[in-house]
A protein has these predicted regions:
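Short S/T/G/P-rich N-terminal loop/turn motif that feeds into the first structured element of a domain
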Residues: 14-102, 114-134
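Outer-membrane beta-barrel domain signature
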Residues: 102-109
Length: 134
């Protein structure tokens, strides 16, 4: 259920009047911090990835960091990360560029040093209502 809510919420950021019913690809990660790592490490990682994204040709994606306020399984994850893409094709292009580059590969290696992720899923999400003006 947590993943479903994360996926739905992340997809909202791609919606506009013309694409409200187009499915978006959303990748979700549920993670715990590795020993000695914490939110400051993630904040630095986000700074680095945002700088890298400025250089990407395929940078049409949104990143969302989720910190649980209440979940049924309190030990499941320290954070969730969602990466929302406009389509599966957009996801493939972005990931091919990211993982195919030295900088992207180094950023992913750093990500794995910070987090231990127990779950990774890709969902197709279709927005059915936009009430928050996002």
């Amino acid at each position: 259920l947590l993943t479903l809510l994360l996926v739905f919420s992340s997809a909202l950021t791609f919606a506009d009047d013309h694409a409200a019913n187009e499915p978006a690809a959303v990748e979700t990660w549920l993670c715990t911090f590795n020993e000695g790592k914490g939110m400051a490490d993630m904040d630095k990682w986000f700074d680095d990835i945002n700088e890298y994204a400025k250089t990407q040709t395929n940078n049409k994606y949104n990143l969302h960091l989720w910190v649980p306020n209440f979940v049924s399984d309190l030990k499941r994850a320290d954070i969730a990360l969602t990466v929302a893409f406009p389509s599966l094709a957009g996801m493939a292009a972005s990931q091919e560029e990211f993982f195919g580059s030295k900088v992207g590969s180094a950023l992913f290696e750093e990500y794995q040093e910070i987090l231990d992720c127990s779950s990774r899923e890709v969902w197709m999400v279709t927005q059915k209502r936009m009430g928050m003006g996002m």
